[in-house]
Amino acid sequence: MQDPRLLMGKPVRERILEEVRSVTEKVDRIGKLVSISIGDVPEVAVYVRNQARAASTAGLPFDQEFWGADVTQDECKAMIQKMNDDPEVLGIILQRPVPDHINVRSLQSAIHPLKDVEGMNPASIGNIVYNDVAMAPCTAAAAVELIRETGLKLEGLEVVMVGHSEIVGKPAAMMLMAEGATVTVCHHLTRSVAMHSRRADVIVVAVGKAHLIGADMVKPGAAVIDIGINQITEADGNTRIVGDVDTDAVKEIAGWVTPVPGGVGPVTVAILMRNAVRAHERQKAAGWYA
């Protein structure tokens, strides 16, 4: 029997994909999602496969583009511009990591905001400041979605965000503030993360440091959303994926904790599909379709 304190992503993923499919089934014509992979990065294949599977479930066409590791920045931008101009392309997904000579932020900026289904264009992230979260960064939006899943009322909630990256920590903090939560953001210069986390109703952690959050840093009954992904080597030499939270210890104290893997990840992919139908709605409102 599954531990009820584990906040699993799969049911949330399935609900969101079902909602997306209910929209796509009513649309006469919808463009395709295009995944761009640059260079040969084996771990990217897993993400692309998960996205393709989710797109199929949601009723969204999905294409894959593979660009060689020797492609130039200018060539990438030119190909992205062609996709921006192509009415058959609904949204563009830029897989990461990319080769060292490619400036990923520049390419994210090159994607038209209305085709930015990942929510990575600076315009998309900037919109969150104005409480426009329709196409927010997927991982940040997934964290907020999982907090909602607990049933906790966001208004007035004490939330501690551990990590302040541009694509997760900062957007998630702004999204939670837009919902009325009181948000404290901790980072590598914070003197005592534990001092803040112990008073939090919700802890969201995304720093990439295995088992950073232990049971002694969590208030009884709190919700803990773990976005971290780390590979550790066990004493027997085997490797495994863990989060930023010591899940086994923390679940004895917390009311909810997302496991890694199986927590935020599945929801992130579903949010990508939800962003896609929102992109379609905004493109239609902008007069892109006859």
Curated annotation (Swiss-Prot):
GO terms for cellular component: cytosol. Keywords: Amino-acid biosynthesis, Histidine biosynthesis, Hydrolase, Methionine biosynthesis, Multifunctional enzyme, NADP, One-carbon metabolism, Oxidoreductase, Purine biosynthesis. Pathway: One-carbon metabolism; tetrahydrofolate interconversion. It catalyses: (6R)-5,10-methylene-5,6,7,8-tetrahydrofolate + NADP(+) = (6R)-5,10-methenyltetrahydrofolate + NADPH; (6R)-5,10-methenyltetrahydrofolate + H2O = (6R)-10-formyltetrahydrofolate + H(+). Its EC number is 1.5.1.5, 3.5.4.9. GO terms for biological process: L-histidine biosynthetic process; methionine biosynthetic process; purine nucleotide biosynthetic process; tetrahydrofolate interconversion. Signal peptide: none annotated. NADP(+) binds at G163, H164, S165, I229. GO terms for molecular function: methenyltetrahydrofolate cyclohydrolase activity; methylenetetrahydrofolate dehydrogenase (NADP+) activity. HAMAP family: THF_DHG_CYH. Belongs to the tetrahydrofolate dehydrogenase/cyclohydrolase family. Catalyzes the oxidation of 5,10-methylenetetrahydrofolate to 5,10-methenyltetrahydrofolate and then the hydrolysis of 5,10-methenyltetrahydrofolate to 10-formyltetrahydrofolate. Homodimer. This is Bifunctional protein FolD 3. It comes from Roseobacter denitrificans (strain ATCC 33942 / OCh 114).
